């Protein structure tokens, strides 16, 4: 199992209120070849959430948008909220492990830009709300 599912009850609603199931996920880091993870993400719909919240890092490859939308297909029929993480904007890039031993000059090397606009459109077209600012 690539992803860990934790169930937590948070007693916030007044007594007698209908229970609300919220599914939160983050850091999917999907690529088109991650078949096991795609299947696992599809299984999240069986949890029957009332609301889905994603806090980013959907992508890990420039060709991942269709993969992400396919993996989330059933969840996209449920009300959802999302923000992007840094990995939704730029591909991961190799980082020299010796950089920790060098002086930090404040510059950051970013990977190639990812098609986050396509992901944004795909999620919003299915009714999810973009909470990025």
Residue spans of the language-model regions?
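Proline/glycine-enriched tight loop/beta-turn segments at coil->beta junctions
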Residues: 16-20, 48
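Histidine-centered divalent metal-coordination motifs
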Residues: 29-31, 87
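N-terminal membrane-anchoring alpha-helices
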Residues: 1-16
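General small-molecule cofactor/ligand-binding pocket signal
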Residues: 11, 23, 129-131
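Active-site-proximal beta-strand elements of phosphoester/diester hydrolases
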Residues: 19-29
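Core catalytic region of metal-dependent phosphoesterases/phosphodiesterases
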Residues: 36-133
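Catalytic core of the metallo-beta-lactamase
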Residues: 12, 31-35
């Amino acid at each position: 199992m690539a992803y860990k599912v934790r169930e937590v009850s948070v007693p916030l609603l007044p007594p007698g209120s209908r229970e609300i199931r919220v599914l939160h996920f983050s850091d999917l880091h999907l690529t088109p070849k991650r078949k096991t993870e795609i299947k696992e993400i599809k299984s999240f719909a069986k949890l029957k959430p009332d609301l889905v919240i994603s806090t980013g890092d959907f992508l890990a490859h420039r060709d991942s948008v269709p993969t992400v939308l396919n993996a989330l297909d059933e969840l996209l029929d449920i009300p959802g909220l999302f923000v992007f993480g840094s990995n939704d904007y730029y591909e991961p890039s190799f980082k020299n492990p010796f950089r920790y031993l060098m002086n930090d000059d404040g510059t950051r090397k970013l990977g190639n830009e990812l098609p986050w606009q396509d992901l944004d459109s795909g999620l919003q077209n299915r009714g999810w709300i973009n909470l990025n600012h």
